[in-house]
Amino acid sequence: MVIYTSKFKNSLLDGLGVGHLSYDDQPILCNEVHPTLTLDTFISGGSSGSRPRPRWVYLDISTTNEGISEEFSSNTESKSPLLKVCGVSSKSSEGDGSSFIWFDKYRSVISRLEHSGFVEVERTVLKLRKISKELRSINKQLSRLFLDDRERAKLLSRKRKYLDFARALIGSISKSLTLYADRFFVEVPQDYAKLIQKLGFSSDTLLLHLFVNSGVLEVFLDDNSSHKFRIAYISKVHAGKYHPVKGISKGSQEAKRVLRDLLVLSELLEGSLVSYRSGGVETIHHLIPVRHFVLTAPKELSFSIWASLKKGDSSLFRAFKDAGAKAIKEFLSYLASKEHISGNLLFGFTINVHVTGDKNPFEPHFHIDAIVTFICYDKSSTKWFRLNPLLSESDLKKLRDIWKNVLLSYFGELLSEDTKSKDFDVWAGDNYYSLPLDVPQVFFELKYASRKLFVNFVNYFEQSNFDESSVSDWDFVRFVFEYSNRTERYGFLTNIKRYLSMSCSHLVEKRVQELEEFISRIEFDLSVNGNKMSDSLKRALLERLEYLKDELSELKERGFEYLFERALEKAEELLSNDNLTLERVIHILETLFTALGKSIVNYNFYVELEDVSFREFVDYLYDNHLSDVLVFSDRHRSITIIRLIPPPDGGVPV
């Protein structure tokens, strides 16, 4: 049996001395009622009604899509049947209804479960950020000193709705097997396959093979209780070139590389980030803030860049990317000057140029997707500074002004007077993240920025039908499918080891002092109390002493190189697929427990099934006579929870 435990440091999931807890196997909600109310419904006061067609278009980012081959032959054989999405035949540009038989049955987790006899009975939308934000707002208002009885009763009524909903949903999860998956595993629109066919791509490009891990997740709460949940998730996947999972995997791989370096920075800069914004007094910070920005080109400019690319000229494209980097640097310099930080400053951020959007991926919509760290390095003083990530309305106006001025300086001659007279779009999100606390969230944002952009067509077909007569430029559509969406690093992110080595020599001295102090304490304890200790405790202290002495010797010999390698190894361990997936599941559960006034402080995951084919997983569901299955379809900002039940006769798994 494999056991995974929480590994992210400094977070609520660290484990705060919670051990030897007795747990209650009974769910919080002991009745047999499942939640039937969506958050949208109970917040607005409406009725749940029948299942609606999705009204949103937002890229969701998978946490488990490693091991994807660049091409996957349709002749690949496996000893066990696997989930297979064949799409439509590329031999005929027209095709017929029968071409979609395999696609309909095997294109997704939901279709496979339904084909195996499970019946969908309910959907619940869980908007994570909205819940957290609303609860914080309610609690803040309830803490006001002067609050009349009517206002208090109204706030408590709103809070009670969240509490009742959370209890019901936690109870449902406690009694079910929950399958967590990115939404591109869960459901893929049929019209996306029609587009693949129209473009003349082989059906092999929609191949999908899935493997599953399943086990028991035990979470420990801050009230000294614990709860168990049966959790499954996608552990491995092989996808064809144009399956949306493949598009997301590109983002996953790049996100891990960038996030690994950010975690190394957070590890080695802990306690070394300086700020002057508190009345001019120097303060020290431990966390690295990160924000997501989008800088959009005017429509007129987007079409000009595409026209240039279509002719084989990439000069406008390169200039647009340079303009984005310049605008971000100017804005960060402005923020630094506000906090009286000066010098030879170097900032750190990534940029992706997106050539189209989610709303209409069939036409050019060029924009800069930037993931920005709110720290900077002064090459003159070799100090690291933290910038305030809370942006005012005047800050956002400054960013819009900077973006417009930079674009006009680069492309003014190409733009009409009407375009020049308008504001240029800028998006800065509604929150920021802190590393190393918010690793899963930052991973999602990086993955979103680095994805293959043909994924946008999947988003589009969630709410729109394929109508080839409305497509005016098929060359652009093909360009989107082949576009690499390269992630560019800027500033200190181009070589973090170089800049850390220039500024962190004191870290070696600090760590040497810590190790020498630890060694001294253990040696003193052994000399004074060694005869009174149990054999097991004494043996443990001796082993720890030997380990610390080895580390001290290595540190004195190799210095900063040793510290950097240790931080790198730690970061890579944290970014394993299993850790990222489990931390995401914990984040979802944490949102529910927060509504109950509780918090998760630690967890263990006991693996029972490891890397089994999806067919074997379905057989497992039948063999264990599980009452129902909850599918958590992760959309990043929200979770669609789909409840399926097996047929009364037990069904025939296929």
Curated annotation (Swiss-Prot):
Its cofactor is Mn(2+). It comes from the Archaea. It catalyses: DNA(n) + a 2'-deoxyribonucleoside 5'-triphosphate = DNA(n+1) + diphosphate; ATP + (deoxyribonucleotide)n-3'-hydroxyl + 5'-phospho-(deoxyribonucleotide)m = (deoxyribonucleotide)n+m + AMP + diphosphate. Its EC number is 2.7.7.31, 3.1.21.-, 6.5.1.1. The N-terminus is blocked when overexpressed in E.coli. The active site is at Y448 (o-(5'-phospho-dna)-tyrosine intermediate). Optimum temperature is 105 degrees Celsius for ssDNA nicking, 75 degrees Celsius for nucleotidyltransferase activity on a ssDNA substrate. Optimum temperature for ssDNA closing is substrate dependent, being 55 and 75 degrees Celsius for the 2 substrates tested. Topoisomerase activity is only seen between 55 and 75 degrees Celsius. Keywords: ATP-binding, Coiled coil, DNA replication, DNA-binding, Endonuclease, Hydrolase, Isomerase, Ligase, Nuclease, Nucleotide-binding, Plasmid, Plasmid copy control, Topoisomerase, Transferase. ATP and dATP inhibit nicking and closing while stimulating nucleotidyltransferase. Disulfide bonds: none annotated. DNA nicking and nucleotidyltransferase are strictly dependent on Mn(2+); Mg(2+) is able to substitute in DNA nicking 5X less efficiently. Residues 535-585 form a coiled coil. GO terms for biological process: DNA replication; plasmid maintenance. One of its GO terms (molecular function) is endonuclease activity. Belongs to the Gram-positive plasmids replication protein type 1 family. Plasmids from hyperthermophilic archaea are relaxed to positively supercoiled at physiological temperatures. Required for rolling circle plasmid replication, has a site-specific endonuclease/ligase activity (nicking and closing). In vitro (no in vivo system yet exists) cleaves the double-stranded origin of replication (dso) site, on an ssDNA template, remaining covalently linked to the 5' end. Religates the appropriate substrates. Has nucleotidyltransferase activity, adding ATP or dATP to the 3' end of the nicked ssDNA site. Both activities require a G nucleotide at the 3' end of the nicking site. This is Replication initiator protein. The gene is rep75.
